[in-house]
Amino acid sequence: MRYPWFRLAIFVVGCLFPVWWLYEAAMNLLGPDPGKIMMDRLGLGALTFLLVTLSMTPLQKLTGWSGWIVVRRQLGLWVFAYIVLHILAYLFFILGLDWGQLAVELRKRPYIIVGALGFLGLLALAVTSNRYSQRRLGARWRKLHRLVYAVLGLGLLHFLWIVRSDLREWAIYAFIGAVLMVLRIPAVARALPRVARKQGRAV
């Protein structure tokens, strides 16, 4: 296994936050509605992991270090794990497993539908994030995994629809996402290694 310590560090970070939040909930440190706080934090955690995942390719182009690409799949699976926990928190703490209430929620809060579409996209990515799927799908695999950009857009829309008024935090996530998308424009992506080489010579 390449870069085991880097992989281990990502695993520890991924586990640490939910465990810490559970500890805070057990110690009554999350206020009067700990379930909602947990749900919100897991959602933001998933969005953060998604942005970090999307930053791996630009970082590799800028630094030339292959470790960024090696952990990209692991980071993507953490996005999926956090989203699953986010949904479970919603079902348990907000709905109380009342499935009849779910239909009411979908009518009242269409941003839930947007989030569900994002989850389905992540599910497709997680299920096919293995070498067997790469071999089976061939060139279609790369096209399928461009779905991650739609997932990012749906995640940001879901977040925007929830906050509505105070957009400062959302704007930070959206700005980072926009920068990462610009870095994927072919002309910009091709220029990144040249920029890195020029900086290296300057140093």
Swiss-Prot record:
A single MF term (Gene Ontology): heme binding
Topological category with respect to the lipid bilayer: Multi-pass membrane protein
Pfam families membership: Ferric_reduct (PF01794)
Cofactor, free-text remark: Binds 1 FMN per subunit.
Keywords: Cell inner membrane, Cell membrane, Electron transport, Flavoprotein, FMN, Heme, Iron, Membrane, Metal-binding, Transmembrane, Transmembrane helix, Transport
Localisation: Cell inner membrane
Main localization, broad class: membrane
Spans traversing the lipid bilayer: 10-30, 42-62, 75-95, 110-130, 147-167, 169-189
Cofactor(s), by name: FMN; heme b
GO terms under biological process: protein repair
GO CC terms: plasma membrane
Similarity comment: Belongs to the MsrQ family.
Function in brief: Part of the MsrPQ system that repairs oxidized periplasmic proteins containing methionine sulfoxide residues (Met-O), using respiratory chain electrons. Thus protects these proteins from oxidative-stress damage caused by reactive species of oxygen and chlorine generated by the host defense mechanisms. MsrPQ is essential for the maintenance of envelope integrity under bleach stress, rescuing a wide series of structurally unrelated periplasmic proteins from methionine oxidation.
Subunit record text: Heterodimer of a catalytic subunit (MsrP) and a heme-binding subunit (MsrQ).
Name of the protein in question: Protein-methionine-sulfoxide reductase heme-binding subunit MsrQ
Lineage summary: Bacteria, Pseudomonadati, Pseudomonadota, Gammaproteobacteria, Pseudomonadales
